[in-house]
Amino acid sequence: MRLRHVVSSLDLTRDDYFRIFELVDKFSNVKKLNYLSGKVVSLAFFEPSTRTAQSFHTAAIKLGADVIGFASEESTSIAKGENLADTIRMLNNYSNCIVMRHKFDGAALFASEISDIPIINAGDGKHEHPTQALIDLYTIYKVFGEIDGRTFGLLGDLKYARTVNSLLRALTRFKPKKVFLISPSQLKVRREILDGLNYPVIETENPYDVIQDIDVLYVTRIQKERFVDEVEYEKVKESYVVDLKLVNMMKKDGIILHPLPRVTEIDRKVDKTTNAKYFYQASLAVPVRMALFYEVLGERKDD
């Protein structure tokens, strides 16, 4: 069954995740295919992006699709006063799928409710970023050969980081042993996210208390752009730095992931350790998004 909209990590079942993982394996080393020849993908980035926009663009081209779109709200008619609904309706006339990033929570869900073509959420405010969770989980799957039974540690800004929300929700489709949530008290995971989880969660402020138990350390930057109060940001902006001291306490086969961009939360010296997998993680963005495009737009025998 073809996927419709991908607004949240919860839009994918466990079977969906594994089916996409199999497709990523097939797409990882290809130069160009024609599976989406004749299709048009709209990249509707109302909020600026570099890595996400470019990887979606590349993924679509490598599958043979044409790509249209915009890289900021200022380059659209919204700058002239057009509302979001009308913009989405217009893009429906030009394309077969909309990849959308927006600064407001829930914008992708709103778009999916009025769109006749699939919406893929490329990040909406502090809400979700489901395709990043796909990349995260595929990285873990490739490194360990499994996701079930692993102990996770999510460190940093767990309140505003949409990548954290999507990963936590995606993990409900698997069987993690437990998840440590490591953050300052001001940046804890929001209650509405915690209430939907079905696995053991332990909150702490000290990574040194739990680092020896962690298989996957997922680090996020402090989201300066999400803070309303500059003073509050200054209080927490350098709460944690993953350095060699911390890494040397990890399991030998433990891994460090980061959705990027990185600021100061991971010391550059960590890059050369065998635990650092965040650049490998980033290298998987294109084939993962190719697999998702194929699931959403590709011709399938069961359609």
From Swiss-Prot:
GO terms for MF: amino acid binding; aspartate carbamoyltransferase activity
UniProt-annotated binding residues for carbamoyl phosphate: 51-52, 101, 129, 132, 260-261
Any single biological process term in GO: 'de novo' UMP biosynthetic process
Domain of life: Archaea
EC number: 2.1.3.2
InterPro entries the UniProt entry points to: Asp/Orn_carbamoyltranf_P-bd, Asp/Orn_carbamoylTrfase, Asp/Orn_carbamoylTrfase_sf, Asp_carbamoyltransf, Asp_carbamoyltransf_Asp/Orn-bd
Keywords: Pyrimidine biosynthesis, Transferase
Metabolic or biological pathway, per its Swiss-Prot or TrEMBL entry: Pyrimidine metabolism; UMP biosynthesis via de novo pathway; (S)-dihydroorotate from bicarbonate: step 2/3
Residues annotated as binding L-aspartate: 80, 162, 221
Catalytically driven reaction(s): carbamoyl phosphate + L-aspartate = N-carbamoyl-L-aspartate + phosphate + H(+)
PROSITE patterns on file: CARBAMOYLTRANSFERASE
SUPFAM superfamilies reported for this sequence: Aspartate/ornithine carbamoyltransferase
Record Pfam families: OTCace, OTCace_N
The keyword Transferase belongs to this UniProt entry's keyword annotation: yes
Top EC class, one word: transferase
Subunit structure: Heterooligomer of catalytic and regulatory chains.
Annotated function: Catalyzes the condensation of carbamoyl phosphate and aspartate to form carbamoyl aspartate and inorganic phosphate, the committed step in the de novo pyrimidine nucleotide biosynthesis pathway.
PANTHER family in the cross-refs: ASPARTATE CARBAMOYLTRANSFERASE, ORNITHINE CARBAMOYLTRANSFERASE, MITOCHONDRIAL
Family: Belongs to the aspartate/ornithine carbamoyltransferase superfamily. ATCase family.
Protein name (record): Aspartate carbamoyltransferase catalytic subunit
Species lineage: Archaea, Thermoproteota, Thermoprotei, Sulfolobales, Sulfolobaceae
Gene name, Swiss-Prot/TrEMBL: pyrB
